[in-house]
Structure formats: C-alpha cells, structure tokens
Amino acid sequence: MNYINFSKSYHVRMLIERDIPLILSLCEKNTQFYEHCPPFVTAESIRDDMCALPQRKMDEPQDKYYLGFFDDAEQLVAVMDFIDHYPTEQSCFIGFFMMERSVQGHGIGSRIITELCVYLHSLGYEYIR
C-alpha cells in the first residue's frame, strides 16, 4: 500500500512533528467537534495521536499513518489517522478524520473518503472502519 495513492484530488503526505502547528490550527477551528468529543485539542494531544496505536498493534508502528491532504496551493485541507491491517489483516481503521473548517460542506471530505475506499478496494481490502 502506498498512502500517496489515497487521493487523486489531493497531495497526501505523512505529517510530522514540525506540522503540529498546522494541524493544531486546522483542529482548533472545529470547535463543535470538541464540544461533543472533549477534551479540546492541544499540541501535546496531537503529538500523542501521531504515534498512538491500539494495544494489538503496538509492535507494528509501520501500520500507523498520520496523514495530511493538501490542495495544489499546499494548504492542509484534511487530517487523517489511519491504521493498516486493523482490526483484521484485510481491513483498516480510520481513527480520526477532520476537514479544514473553511472547505467543509463542499463534498471534499466525501471525495477524499470515496477515493480512499476505491484505492483500498483495488488492493483487496474487505472492510474500512
């Protein structure tokens, strides 16, 4: 699996420590999410999420992808926490997916998820959670 193929519409890359301010900015704009799913985001919570894995996957950090989806202007439009081969070998888990507030409601998130599903189906994945 190659995560750069997760989207045909956006550039996908792994997010790293230096991206935390960018991720934090995107997340902080989505206050309604954190009203329903506290606590509110912090740089430390993002840092923790970037490496968090379910207990069964602790020995397989290579299956963890904390991804950014960028438009042609290199603006971050979405963040995704993706775990490969979980909970089964032919499935994957999206632990977190958040869109830039200013582009919500235009079908971009649906397009990203649809493109991801098409790609994973082409690889034989049976289930996406």
Where are these regions (language model features)?
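Hydrophobic pocket/interface hotspot
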Residues: 23-24
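Conserved beta-strand in the GNAT
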Residues: 68, 75-84, 93, 98
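Short loop/turn motifs at secondary-structure junctions and domain boundaries
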Residues: 56-62
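Short strand-connecting beta-turns/loops that link adjacent beta-strands
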Residues: 17-18, 72-75, 87-89
